[in-house]
Every structure is written in structure tokens, then in C-alpha cells.
């Protein structure tokens, strides 16, 4: 991953634009019947928890809810498969704060596996943080997106 200013085409050092979590959120935001990863599989062993998360994202969903967005600027979308929700948020090169309202969830407690841009993601696009927490339909999550950043979660009923 690379920030906007550091991105370049180099054959022996492939990179993608945007933060690590921006790339992870794409698996939820963009509906695609065939998901794939670029590069050598051994490259993904460095951050196994990211690969494990991506592997759990289905290629088809039962329900889709557009939570927020503005064309060419940002998007937040929730998709359900069975009893599991996947939420993805992505921004363009403008950093932003957003609130993700979880009122689409049914009653009860859920476990949210969350990946967010790290504190240094605006300078080091691979920086991310992972959090696991209990959430309910009453929660509103405050999210900070780095330039070219993202946020994603897998939410399962407890």
C-alpha cells in the first residue's frame, strides 16, 4: 500500500493506492462474484489477520444497505450474509470523520471484528489497527479515515 505521494509503478516492488484498510474495505464495498488477491501468496503471511478477514467476506450477500456516501468522495455500506454483517467505508484522498450508525442490526449483542486506519496511515499506508468489541443496534461508531483510507468490520450475533 502507498499514500498518494509515494505511489509509483515499480516492477520489483508492487503497490496499491490507499491504505491497507481501504483495500480490505473494497471486498465489502464492491460486490464481485470472484474475489482475488494480487501478488505472491507468501506476501500475505506477513499480516495473516488481514488475510483471514478477507477470506471471510462472501462473494454474494442477502441484503445491502447504503449507510452514507457521496459520489467520488466517500461511501459506507453494510451487507448481510445469513446472520453476519460486513460493513465497509472508504474515502478518496480527503481525510474525514464519519459516524456509522448500527441501527440496521437486530436486537441483542454482536461481536464486531474491526479494522481501521492506524494513527500513522496518512504517512505509512500499511499502518492499521484491529479491535474486537461488543456492539448493539443502539451504537454509533465514530470513525477516522486517513487520506485514501478505509474502515471495515465483520459483525456477528453473540
Predicted segments with their positions:
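Solvent-exposed beta-hairpin/edge-strand motifs
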Residues: 104-118
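Carbohydrate-binding surface patches
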Residues: 71-107, 151-152
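Edge strands and adjacent loops of beta-rich recognition modules
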Residues: 51-77
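Glycan-recognition surfaces
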Residues: 1-41, 68
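C-terminal beta-strand-rich structural cap/linker in extracellular carbohydrate-active enzymes
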Residues: 132-158
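Conserved, mostly hydrophobic/aromatic
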Residues: 29, 87, 148
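Solvent-exposed beta-strand/loop surfaces of large extracellular or lumenal domains
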Residues: 114-138
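Beta-strand-rich interaction surfaces with strong enrichment in secreted/lumenal proteins
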Residues: 64-65, 76-77, 85, 130-132, ...
Amino acid at each position: 500500500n502507498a499514500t498518494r505521494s509515494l505511489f509509483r509503478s515499480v516492477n520489483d516492488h508492487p503497490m496499491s493506492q490507499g491504505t491497507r484498510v481501504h483495500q480490505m474495505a473494497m471486498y465489502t464495498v464492491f460486490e464481485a462474484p470472484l474475489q482475488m488477491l494480487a501478488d505472491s501468496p507468501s506476501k500475505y503471511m506477513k499480516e495473516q489477520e488481514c488475510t483471514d478477514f478477507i477470506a471471510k467476506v462472501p462473494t454474494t450477500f442477502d441484503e445491502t444497505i447504503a449507510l452514507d456516501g457521496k459520489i467520488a468522495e466517500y461511501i459506507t455500506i453494510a451487507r448481510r450474509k445469513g446472520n453476519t454483517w460486513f460493513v465497509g467505508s472508504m474515502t478518496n484522498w480527503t481525510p474525514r470523520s464519519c459516524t456509522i450508525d448500527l441501527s440496521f442490526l437486530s436486537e441483542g449483542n454482536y461481536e464486531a471484528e474491526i479494522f481501521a486506519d492506524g494513527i500513522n496511515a496518512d504517512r505509512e499506508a500499511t499502518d492499521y489497527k484491529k479491535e474486537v468489541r461488543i456492539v448493539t443496534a443502539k451504537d454509533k461508531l465514530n470513525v477516522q479515515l486517513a487520506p485514501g483510507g478505509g474502515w471495515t468490520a465483520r459483525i456477528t450475533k453473540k
